[in-house]
């Protein structure tokens, strides 16, 4: 069977895709959402947020799924950057359409000296199911 590549990007929505008939293995390259940058402070810009975690799954055996197969992909969004303001809230968390959103960044101090923390990136999930099943 030929190798077929499908790329999913963050949309804020669950994305569904049917796998080709006869597919028996999957190889996945998965990135989580990146963290937001820290807010600037009185000495300069805040640091960049960390990249989303990367995972590779090679030759995942999906032959036990009897019928046609589909995947549901939820791409994690990036965290929002912090800001410089007295009592500023931390950056918003990166969203996921699953319950695995990133954490909210820490708040700034009471005066405009330290910036708030950037929000954490959302998780990316991939779920395999038999076509025709409710997901």
Residue ranges and their predicted role:
Residues 11-13, 30-129:
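Glycine-rich strand-loop-strand elements at beta-sheet edges
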Residues 1-37:
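GGW-centered surface loops in extracellular recognition modules
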Residues 131-135:
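Short, intrinsically disordered, charge-balanced linker/junction segments flanking boundaries
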């Amino acid at each position: 069977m030929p190798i077929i590549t499908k790329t999913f990007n963050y949309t804020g929505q669950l994305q569904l895709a049917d796998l080709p008939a006869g597919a028996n293995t999957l190889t996945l390259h998965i990135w989580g959402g990146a963290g937001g940058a820290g807010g600037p402070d009185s000495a300069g810009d805040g640091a960049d947020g960390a990249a989303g975690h990367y995972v590779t799954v090679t030759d995942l055996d999906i032959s036990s799924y009897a019928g046609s197969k589909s995947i549901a992909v939820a791409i994690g969004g990036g965290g929002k950057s912090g800001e410089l303001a007295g009592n500023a809230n931390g950056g918003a968390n990166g969203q996921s359409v699953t319950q695995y959103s990133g954490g909210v960044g820490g708040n700034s101090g009471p005066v405009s000296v330290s910036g708030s923390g950037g929000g954490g990136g959302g998780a990316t999930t991939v779920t395999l199911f038999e076509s025709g099943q409710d997901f």
